[in-house]
Amino acid sequence: MAFLTACGTANSDLEMPKYTVLSNAVYDGQYNIEIRDYAPRLAAEVTVKGEREAALSEGFRILADYIFGNNTAKTDIAMTAPVTQSSNAKIAMTAPVTQVESAQGWVVQFTMPAQYTTETLPKPNNQQIQILITKPLRMAALRFSGFSSETRFQNRAKILADYLTQQKIATLGPPEFAYYNDPFTFPWRKRNEVLIPIVSSP
């Protein structure tokens, strides 16, 4: 998936969203599932119609264009990990790039580096891009390596949903897909995740 080339390999060099692991469990003897609390974070997102992989490619291109200088400050914004950058200042890229299906299409999101606020983050020139602060979320997460094919993601999404049903944990929305690596990373070293928002315990 060449659209992730700019992301680089997810490692300690890339900033990632902060979360707290509340619990973990092994499901069906092999799937490690975590329950996480995510803090609010500043993000840029775009909604794209089409099949999942094509929509991710187009959404990544639009958001990468923004962080690499197509913004009101003409500033590079450093990338973060996962996918859910005036002068030559940098907006670092984060990881992962995240993707979730909505009624309007696929929402592709980049988390913005923690150094920015809504006031200091350069504004996108492309009006398709929305800047927002995410709500605090509790998420169930299933991590896996290998290729991020449609079949693998849908399979892992079903496994995670089955676990939540078994545990009688109510969900709040559709699965979110998180991509941490570039396409040149060896498959067994890739980090992919399926995340499902869930109800917080009272």
Write out the residue ranges for each language-model feature.
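A solvent-exposed interaction/effector surface
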Residues: 2-202
